[in-house]
């Protein structure tokens, strides 16, 4: 079977980590690839901060050592439980993998397929596989799952970092380290941008089937208050077109009616896949984006590929995985320190401005 680019990158990182420094030509020979391919790989990995590169020579970053001369991450086994290995969490996993490789640790992955009742067994499987600490993104879809299937996380016998999930204030889970995107900030960025373009209170079209969707909804209500806006019509419930065609059509019709009646000229849509399909269906009904409706997508997996490239809020998913892994390695290398304060890190999304809200150039806010 042909080696994937990710597997080749792992081998390249292992070679540099083992040797400390190496020339690009030497790496090409050891990897069995052309010098051009090796150079491209090195540039990519150096751009991600995983390697240092100077004049054809590659070195392992000196800053990877633990502060104070303590144990490094070399040889650590880290576990990662994710609800999915695709779409949103693919980038989170990639960031975690890169950070683990940089630390000299090995990352072991388990996927729950959004079955929260299996989270505990899969996490115990990670521990049985040798994980010394775990990154956990439970398969919760809402607060009821968190209440029913969450308490065990606080009882794990190893350092644990919660990924892209928030705990109920005051609960045992609230005492865990966690790293998550600040979706409230992302919603605020989107609404401020639409208001700056002269639109009245934008509508929200959003799902209800994930913690991200619920965080976007909560962030919308909070942003309205922050911006001093009157609450418009209720949030339009969106569903995937392939899962519920009738529900999807109801959402499109509700947005169509709001636009054609003059009640709304701007909307934020979660997520970008739904946004692309909604824009296509609106066009069939005679509503044009951005001429009749300024639209921003929440999430930026495929937003740039739409016929009219969509302005999008981009959660920092790769950085979430990276920072969470670095935090876990820090906990493991520092040893048991009961005085070490637990951290709740909220990483800020960016707004990538494209054509769907009336802009003509691509930029990030």
Spans of model-derived segments:
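N-terminal helix-turn-helix DNA-binding module of bacterial transcription factors
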Residues: 1-72
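Alpha-helical recognition/docking segments in bacterial nutrient-uptake
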Residues: 7, 11, 25, 43-46, ...
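Short, solvent-exposed amphipathic alpha-helices that sit
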Residues: 11, 88-102, 186-189, 211-231, ...
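Periplasmic-binding protein-like
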Residues: 79, 131-140, 201-207, 261-271, ...
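Short beta-strand elements in bilobed, periplasmic/extracellular small-molecule ligand-binding domains
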Residues: 101-111, 204, 221-251
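Hydrophobic alpha-helical segments within soluble ligand-binding/sensing domains
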Residues: 167-169, 174-204, 214, 248-255, ...
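An alpha-beta-alpha
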Residues: 188-229, 341-356
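Flexible loop/turn connectors
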Residues: 256-365
């Amino acid at each position: 079977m042909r080696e994937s680019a990710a597997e080749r990158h792992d081998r390249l990182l292992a070679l540099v980590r083992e040797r400390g420094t190496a020339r690009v030509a030497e790496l090409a020979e050891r990897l069995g690839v052309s010098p051009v391919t090796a150079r491209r790989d090195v540039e990519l990995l150096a751009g991600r901060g995983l390697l240092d590169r100077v004049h054809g020579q590659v070195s392992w970053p000196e800053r990877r050592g633990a502060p104070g001369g303590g144990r490094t991450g070399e040889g650590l086994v880290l576990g990662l439980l994710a609800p999915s290995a695709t779409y949103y969490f693919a980038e989170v996993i990639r960031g975690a993998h890169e950070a683990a490789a940089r630390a000299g640790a090995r990352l072991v992955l388990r996927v729950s397929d959004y079955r929260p009742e299996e989270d505990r067994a899969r996490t115990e499987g990670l521990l049985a596989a040798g994980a010394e600490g775990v990154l956990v993104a439970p398969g919760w879809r809402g607060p009821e799952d968190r209440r029913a299937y969450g308490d065990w996380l606080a009882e794990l016998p190893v350092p644990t970092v919660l990924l892209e999930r928030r705990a109920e204030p005051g609960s045992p889970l609230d005492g865990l380290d966690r790293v998550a995107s600040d979706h409230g900030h992302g919603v605020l960025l989107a609404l401020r941008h639409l208001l700056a373009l002269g639109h009245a209170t934008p509508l929200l079209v959003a799902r209800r089937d994930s913690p991200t969707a619920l965080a976007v909804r909560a962030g919308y209500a909070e942003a309205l208050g922050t911006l001093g806006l009157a609450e418009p019509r209720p949030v339009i419930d969106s569903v995937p077109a392939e899962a519920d065609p009738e529900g999807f059509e109801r959402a499109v019709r509700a947005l169509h009616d709001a636009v054609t009646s003059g009640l709304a000229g701007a909307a934020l849509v979660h997520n970008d896949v739904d946004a692309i399909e909604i824009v296509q269906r609106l066009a069939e009904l005679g509503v044009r984006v951005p001429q009749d409706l300024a639209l921003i997508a929440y999430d930026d997996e495929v937003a740039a590929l739409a016929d009219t490239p969509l302005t999008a809020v981009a959660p920092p998913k790769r950085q979430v995985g990276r920072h969470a892994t670095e935090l876990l390695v820090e906990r493991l290398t520092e040893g048991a320190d009961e005085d070490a304060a637990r951290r709740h890190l909220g990483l800020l999304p960016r707004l990538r401005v494209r054509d769907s809200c009336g802009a003509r150039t691509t930029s990030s806010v």
